[in-house]
């Protein structure tokens, strides 16, 4: 852990934060979870904190040497839209101000590959910014705030990590919904299924976050992706093989799928209820989302789980005999 004495995991009650806390416990790293929501697994390590409330931040960050910021509004359908900016952007401003006021010189920020938007080729850290939604736009704004914080002094350390979509046991996001549909045997493949998808396994990204504690002062930017990328067809084959099922995917033309998505958007707007299908989710599903990192090789990191093994572990624990 080097010179650091105590780590604050802001937004640490969630999926990535809990997996990170598991590793901190194993490695005897002193940490506090700062979150609006009480940590179910590590209640004794938790303190209430809201990144939009500067007073609660500065009070609870006192005594820490390094901040890992995992807090974010990230779902597709956050309302009002201003919440993305209140949490992701104003939260970044508050964290940077608190860090300066408390003389904390080290910040690790989890951004997102959403800052690149839809990509047509494998995209590394030099990719062009073109976020298509408010999540990506707010993450990009937050990055600029952290960059300005770092540039204000020569002795600071800023690690900005842009993970691709994260999955693992216990997560109930878009990847879980995809795995569940495939595992159910009632999966409709919209499009050809040849689009490649980059993913990141939660235990691997947690291990990388631990690894960042040893980084020296300076600026560090890394896309986090577990390679190799699978096409949707390959991914479904891995899942069906794991479950011992026959691959029986029904394929639907893209134009039919996207029209269905717009129909669900209308129903959702009329009913005021979130529905499992939307046009944006179908666009994401059918898009080629392929990312890589040119920078990660500089940090001597080896992910503990190969991607195929991580998928099999997740599918086995979530869907086997269910």
Give a label for each model feature.
Residues 40, 51-90, 98, 116:
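NAD(P)H-binding glycine-rich loop region in Rossmannoid oxidoreductase-like domains
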Residues 94-134, 154:
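Conserved Rossmann-fold NAD(P)-dependent oxidoreductase catalytic core, especially the SDR/UDP-sugar
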Residues 132-159:
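Active-site Tyr-X1-5-Lys
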Residues 168, 190-195, 222-230, 240-243, ...:
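Glycine-rich Rossmann NAD(P)(H)-binding loop
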Residues 171-177, 191-213, 220:
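Substrate-positioning beta->alpha
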């Amino acid at each position: 852990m080097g010179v650091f004495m105590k780590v604050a995991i802001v937004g640490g009650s969630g999926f990535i934060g809990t997996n990170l806390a598991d590793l901190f416990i194993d490695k005897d790293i002193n940490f506090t979870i700062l979150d609006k929501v009480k940590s179910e697994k590590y209640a004794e390590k938790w303190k209430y904190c809201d990144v939009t409330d500067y007073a609660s931040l500065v009070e609870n960050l006192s005594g820490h040497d390094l901040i890992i910021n995992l807090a974010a509004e990230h779902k597709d359908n956050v309302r009002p839209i201003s919440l993305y900016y209140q949490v992701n952007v104003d939260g970044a401003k508050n964290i940077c101000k608190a860090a300066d006021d408390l003389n904390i010189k080290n910040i690790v920020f989890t951004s997102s590959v959403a800052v690149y938007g839809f990509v047509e080729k494998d995209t590394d850290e030099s990719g062009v910014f073109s976020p298509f939604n408010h999540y990506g736009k707010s993450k990009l704004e937050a990055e600029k705030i952290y960059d300005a914080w770092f540039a204000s002094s020569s002795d600071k350390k800023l690690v900005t990590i842009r993970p691709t979509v994260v999955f693992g046991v216990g997560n109930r996001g878009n990847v879980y919904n995809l795995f569940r549909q495939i595992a159910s045997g009632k999966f409709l493949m919209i499009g050809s299924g040849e689009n490649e998808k980059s993913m990141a396994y939660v235990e691997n990204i947690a291990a990388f976050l631990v690894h960042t504690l040893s980084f020296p002062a300076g600026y560090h930017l890394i896309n986090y992706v577990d390679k190799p990328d699978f096409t949707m067809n390959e991914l479904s084959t891995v899942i069906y093989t794991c479950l011992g099922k026959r691959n029986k995917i029904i394929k639907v033309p893209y134009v039919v799928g996207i029209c269905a998505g717009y129909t669900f958007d209308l129903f959702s707007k009329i009913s005021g209820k979130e529905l499992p299908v939307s046009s944006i989710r179908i666009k994401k599903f059918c898009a080629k989302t392929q990312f890589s990192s040119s920078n990660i090789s500089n940090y001597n990191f080896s992910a503990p789980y190969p991607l195929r093994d991580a998928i099999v572990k997740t599918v086995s624990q979530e869907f086997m005999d269910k």
